């Protein structure tokens, strides 16, 4: 039988199909970097043309990529749109990349959403990783840490952080009592978010921070407009056309960044009007003094502008993770009342009821500390670090990793790795205690990933851990949290840069003893 009779395709159609196949094959090969002899590219699943693995990622990329790591290993590669993305899982692999090979992986990808933060001048989101970035990071970290541990001579508190947290925690207790006297229930997030904002605001701006500003409250209660688009795998970063199409989430993100920057500008300018370099009492004052003393190194930017850019990062580092952690903690407490009772027994034994908890009590409250660590691990509310990128060609675990490759660090996978935790789905604070339940296991606590690693580690980590501890210690000393019988608390997170718990408007709080 002749070929023309055996096939329904014409010679022209077959030729066109062959040409198309060759073109697609050539494009795919062109996308792939040239791999040096003896090395290989990271493995990964087959991807759809144009859209890559976006359908695979779905609404919970941290879960999807954790499943893929079980099949392809700790170093795998996917595509989002046409952009290759390296995904790192496994504690040892991540530590190798971010710590031992930290200089190779310290970059940031040049993503569209990053350019909208602080007009593209954010130290945290900026692709720059050179000496200027390193100096700015040191300055921000030193300012934040200094005013966490520095003390106010007029206060009985050990440091500014303790003074501000104690004040806001007491105010929060009063607010919860007021809500209980009214509706008899509340959503803790709506009120925790304002209290935490007041703490970092007071540390940054001192008396200049507006404690009851409607603008401030509106901003901090709408941070979800930021974290949704700033999350790893945000479509707008990988599909450029989305910048030009109707996109409500992107518009909210732009609006939030614009409003937040304007708010900080106003605060910084007001502070600068009565700045006295001989009387520095907050982070902004310390930054003004630094830039004034080092005016030749200002890089052409006015002190106010440089200060706004840094405060944008400092405020974020000392605000959203802390708010999210406390909110998750309260929900774990109401769903695990026996754990709450153990924490309160520890507080009663160590501190009693005659005085308030202090930061110096932290080492004497191992069960509370274990609960906080388990909240970090189980919720993994920062599922990925802010994306990294490679600044030069390198290798990792025998795989060739080219320069300028976008890198996702899957912290959620580490915190739920059965090889590390045995029963990762169980909420069990005791796992972090030593055999005598008197101290925290340093080895195990260092395996919890929430603040990143290496040269891009979150500058607010120390502040966050201290502040979360003190807020919870004060709240739990005085209040017992619960939900009404029959109410089921939804612990399903909403994916974002930080994953928030679902709103829970049924939380109740009662005083454990009369407050003097």
Curated annotation (Swiss-Prot):
One of its GO terms (cellular component) is endoplasmic reticulum membrane. Substrate binds at residue 226. Its EC number is 1.14.14.1, 4.2.1.152. It is found in: Endoplasmic reticulum membrane; Microsome membrane. GO terms for biological process: arachidonate metabolic process; cholesterol metabolic process; estrogen metabolic process; hormone biosynthetic process; progesterone metabolic process; retinol metabolic process. It comes from the Eukaryota. Gene3D superfamilies: Cytochrome P450. Glycans are attached at residue 69. It catalyses: an organic molecule + reduced [NADPH--hemoprotein reductase] + O2 = an alcohol + oxidized [NADPH--hemoprotein reductase] + H2O + H(+); 17beta-estradiol + reduced [NADPH--hemoprotein reductase] + O2 = 2-hydroxy-17beta-estradiol + oxidized [NADPH--hemoprotein reductase] + H2O + H(+); 17beta-estradiol + reduced [NADPH--hemoprotein reductase] + O2 = 4-hydroxy-17beta-estradiol + oxidized [NADPH--hemoprotein reductase] + H2O + H(+); estrone + reduced [NADPH--hemoprotein reductase] + O2 = 2-hydroxyestrone + oxidized [NADPH--hemoprotein reductase] + H2O + H(+). Pathway: Cofactor metabolism; retinol metabolism; Steroid metabolism; cholesterol metabolism; Lipid metabolism; arachidonate metabolism. SUPFAM superfamilies: Cytochrome P450. InterPro entries: Cyt_P450, Cyt_P450_CS, Cyt_P450_E_grp-I, Cyt_P450_E_grp-I_CYP1, Cyt_P450_sf. It is a peripheral membrane protein. Interacts with PGRMC1; the interaction requires PGRMC1 homodimerization. This is Cytochrome P450 1A2. It comes from Balaenoptera acutorostrata.
């Amino acid at each position: 039988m002749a070929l023309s009779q055996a096939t329904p395709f014409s010679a022209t159609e077959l030729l066109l199909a062959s040409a198309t196949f060759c073109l697609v094959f050539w494009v795919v090969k062109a996308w792939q970097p040239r791999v040096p002899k003896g090395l290989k590219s990271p493995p990964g699943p087959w991807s759809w043309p144009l859209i890559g693995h976006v359908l695979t990622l779905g609404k919970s990329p941290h879960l999807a990529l954790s499943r893929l790591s079980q099949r392809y290993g700790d170093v795998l590669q996917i595509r989002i749109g046409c952009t290759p993305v390296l995904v790192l899982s496994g504690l040892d692999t991540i530590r190798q990349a971010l710590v031992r090979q930290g200089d190779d992986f310290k970059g940031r990808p040049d993503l569209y959403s990053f350019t909208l933060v602080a007009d593209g001048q954010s130290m945290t989101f900026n692709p720059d990783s050179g000496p200027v970035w390193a100096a700015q990071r040191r300055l921000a970290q030193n300012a934040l840490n200094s005013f966490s541990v520095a003390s106010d001579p007029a206060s009985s508190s050990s440091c500014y952080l303790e003074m501000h947290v104690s004040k806001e925690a007491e105010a929060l207790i009063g607010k919860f009592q007021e809500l209980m006297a009214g509706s008899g229930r509340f959503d803790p997030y709506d009120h925790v978010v304002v209290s935490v904002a007041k703490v970092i605001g007071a540390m940054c701006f001192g008396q200049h921070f507006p404690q009851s500003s409607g603008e401030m409250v509106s901003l901090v209660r709408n941070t979800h407009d930021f974290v949704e688009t700033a999350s790893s795998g945000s479509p707008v970063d990988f599909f450029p056309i989305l910048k030009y199409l109707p996109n409500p989430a992107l518009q909210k993100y732009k609006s939030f960044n614009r409003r937040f920057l304007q708010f900080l500008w106003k605060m910084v300018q007001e502070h600068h009007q009565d700045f006295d370099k001989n009387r520095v009492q907050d982070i902004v004052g310390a930054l003004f003094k630094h830039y004034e003393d080092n005016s030749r190194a200002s890089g052409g930017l006015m002190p106010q502008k440089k200060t706004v850019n840094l405060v944008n990062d400092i405020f974020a580092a000392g605000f959203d993770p802390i708010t999210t952690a406390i909110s998750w903690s309260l929900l774990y407490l109401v769903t695990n009342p026996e754990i709450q009772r153990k924490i309160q027994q520890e507080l009663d034994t160590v501190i009693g009821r005659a005085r308030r908890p202090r930061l110096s009590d932290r080492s004497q409250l191992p069960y509370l500390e274990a609960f906080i660590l388990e909240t970090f691990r189980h919720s993994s509310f920062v599922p990925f670090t802010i994306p990294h990128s490679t600044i030069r060609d390198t290798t990792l675990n025998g795989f060739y990793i080219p320069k300028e490759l976008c890198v996702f660090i899957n912290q959620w996978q580490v915190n739920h790795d059965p090889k590390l935790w045995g029963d990762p789905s169980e909420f069990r604070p005791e796992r972090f205690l030593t055999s005598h339940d008197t101290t925290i296991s340093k080895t195990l606590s260092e395996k919890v990933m929430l603040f990143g690693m290496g040269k891009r580690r979150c500058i607010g980590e120390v502040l966050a851990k201290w502040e979360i501890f003190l807020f919870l210690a004060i709240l739990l000393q005085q209040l017992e949290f619960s939900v009404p019988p029959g109410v089921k608390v939804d612990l399903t997170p909403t994916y974002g840069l930080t994953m928030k718990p679902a709103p829970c408007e049924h939380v109740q709080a009662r005083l454990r003893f009369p407050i003097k």
